[in-house]
Amino acid sequence: TMAEHNELGKWGEEQAALYLRSKGWYIRHRDWHCGHRDVDIVAIDEDSSIVIFVEVKTRSTGQWGEPDEAIDLEKQNSIIQTAGSYIRNFRLEYCEVRYDTISIVGTPATGAQITHKENAFDLASRFFYREHVRYRRRKRPGNW
């Protein structure tokens, strides 16, 4: 059900936050909203030089592949834009910025299997994709 799905997601974010703390990250915000966009976890390292924006995806089983495969280009774009608002809002322009994903497979009963991908995507990969799409559109006007 949707309620169970949301509960699993909340549990997954909790596991991700605990994991990041254990690695020495300080959790600044969880579920930070800007308009209709949001970012699951914003964390910063101990000397405040790197800020990470983390998208967490949780699935009860791994049978459909890695949970973070669900983070499509549109979602990546949304996270990058939200991060920009966050950085301006909290005056973090001096920080290095990184976009990470954390995939969680499991349930409260089975425990969490955690996969943390650092630098999972960035602005450069987004720009490359946009150029690629524009090129394809010019080549095949009939199909769009």
Regions found by a protein language model. Give the residues of each.
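Short beta-strand or tight-loop elements
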Residues: 23-24, 35-39, 97
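Acidic-basic catalytic patches of nuclease active cores, encompassing PD-(D/E)XK
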Residues: 1-31, 110
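Domain-level recognition of nuclease-like catalytic cores that cleave nucleotide substrates
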Residues: 89-144
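Short strand-connecting beta-turns/loops that link adjacent beta-strands
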Residues: 35, 46-48, 109-110
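Conserved catalytic cores of phosphodiester-cleaving nucleases, focusing on short active-site segments
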Residues: 20, 39-43, 48-62, 79
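Catalytic cores of nucleic-acid endonucleases
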Residues: 58-108
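Residues at secondary-structure transition points
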Residues: 3, 7, 11, 36, ...
